[in-house]
Amino acid sequence: MFNKKNREIYKKIVEEQHYCQLCGSTCWLEIHHIYYRSQGGNNDERNLIRLCKKCHELVHSNKKKWQKFLLEKQHIKYGEFDEKDLRN
């Protein structure tokens, strides 16, 4: 559901992440859920990362590999957190 809180979180991600967090591209940027919504992933900002269209497709081609890598990246950025907080 895209309520006011979710819009604010997405806006923050867009404002803070001006480039793909994998390759550095500034073209065709999208927001990716590290824990997919189909896995119960929520819109916690630690579960969201900005990727270009090409990297977004790459990440979706090998979920497990990239999920682990992106979670490690988020732990570096945000410090330690319980990954259960990223799921509903």
Residue map of PLM features:
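Short, charged surface segments at domain edges that flank catalytic/cofactor-binding sites
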Residues: 1-19, 40-42, 69-72, 77-87
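Histidine-centered nuclease catalytic patch
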Residues: 21-50
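Short Cys/His-centered divalent metal-binding micro-motifs
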Residues: 28, 48-69
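Charge-rich, low-complexity amphipathic helices
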Residues: 31, 53, 57, 73-81
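Intrinsic structural disorder/low-complexity segments
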Residues: 35-36, 59, 63, 77
